[in-house]
Amino acid sequence: MSIAGLVTTLPWLMNMLRAVPGATGRFERFAGWCYEQLLLKRESLAVERATNHNHEPRDVMTWLINSMDEGDRCAPPTESALQEDARTLISAGSDTVAITFTNILYFLVKHPTIYQKLQRLMDHEFPQGYSSWTYNKAKGVPYIDYIIHETLRLRPAVPMGFLRQTPPQGLQIDEIFIPGDVIVNVPTYTIHRDSRYFYDAAKFIPERWEELSPDTAAYLAFQRGPFTCSGKNLATMQLRMLISCLALRYRIHFAPGEDGVAFATQEKETLTMWIPPLQMVFRPR
C-alpha cells in the first residue's frame, strides 16, 4: 500500500498509473477485496430489511449505505465515492490501532520509568489484579490517555495529514494569504514536533498532557472539525483496553538482538505509517 502515500498528495497520478500494466496491481487487489466486502455488507442489510430486522446502525458503513438509499444530502455523491469510503474505513479501522499500539510498546520499553509509573497506577486502581479489570475503571486513569496522546504526537498513525481546499474567496492566516480553490495540507508529523507548540518536542513526555488538551493544542492525530476521525472514540477505547491490560499482566522488554533502532528510524509514509517489525518479550508479572 506504499503507493497510497504518494497518490494521496498527487491524486491525479492514480489515473495515470492505472494505465500502466502492473503498476497498481497490489492496490487493485486490495480495492477489489474492499469492494467485495461492500457487496457482502449490502447483502446482509438487504436480508435484515426483508426480514424486518432493521435496527439502529452500529457501524459507519451501514450509515453510509442507508444515507445513499434514502437520498440523504450527506450521502456519498456516487457509487465510486462509496467504494472509496469502504477502502478508507477498512484501512483506517485496522492498521492505525495496530500501528499505534506497537509504537506505544516501543516507547514503554525505551522509557521503563514511565511503564513502571503506569503499572503502579493500575495496581492502585485494581488491587486484586487483572481478574478485577473493568473498562469503566481503566478509562478513569488519565495517565493512559497521556501515553496515547504522546505516542500519537511523536508517531501519528497518519503522519501526512489530509488535503483540503481553500474557500473560493481565499484564506487569510495572520500575514499570509492563500488564494481560493487551492489544495493545502497541514503536515501532522511536522506540526507535532514543532518546538513552538511543545517543549522538548522530540522527547516522549506523557506528563505534558497534564496541562495540555488534545482539543486545544496543536494536535492533529485525529484531524479537527467536521472531518475529524469517525473512529476516534472506538480507537481510543481499544488502546485504553490494550494499555491497561498490558500493564496489569506483563513485564515487557526487547527480545535478544533487538534494540529498537531500526524500528525508530526506518518507518515510512504510506498514508498510514509503515513500521518495521519490533521483536519483544512479554513475561507474566
Curated annotation (Swiss-Prot):
Disruption phenotype: Abolishes the production of eupenifeldin as well as of the intermediate humulenol. Pathway: Secondary metabolite biosynthesis; terpenoid biosynthesis. It is an enzyme of class 1 (oxidoreductase). Eupenifeldin is a bistropolone-humulene meroterpenoid first discovered as an antitumor and anti-leukemia agent. This metabolite also shows anthelmintic activity against the parasitic worm Hemonchus contortus, anti-malarial activity as well as antifungal activity. It comes from the Eukaryota. InterPro entries: Cyt_P450 (IPR001128), Cyt_P450_E_grp-I (IPR002401), Cyt_P450_sf (IPR036396), Cytochrome_P450_monoxygenase (IPR050121). One of its GO terms (molecular function) is monooxygenase activity. SUPFAM superfamilies: Cytochrome P450. Its cofactor is heme. Its EC number is 1.-.-.-. GO terms for biological process: terpenoid biosynthetic process. The keyword Oxidoreductase applies. Keywords: Heme, Iron, Metal-binding, Monooxygenase, Oxidoreductase, Signal. Residues 1-19 form the signal peptide. The keyword Heme applies. Heme binds at C229. Belongs to the cytochrome P450 family. Cytochrome P450 monooxygenase; part of the gene cluster that mediates the biosynthesis of eupenifeldin, a bistropolone meroterpenoid that acts as an antitumor agent. The first step of eupenifeldin biosynthesis is the biosynthesis of 3-methylorcinaldehyde performed by the non-reducing polyketide synthase eupA. Oxidative dearomatization of 3-methylorcinaldehyde likely catalyzed by the FAD-dependent monooxygenase eupB is followed by oxidative ring expansion by the 2-oxoglutarate-dependent dioxygenase eupC to provide the first tropolone metabolite, tropolone stipitaldehyde. This is Cytochrome P450 monooxygenase eupD. It comes from Phoma sp.
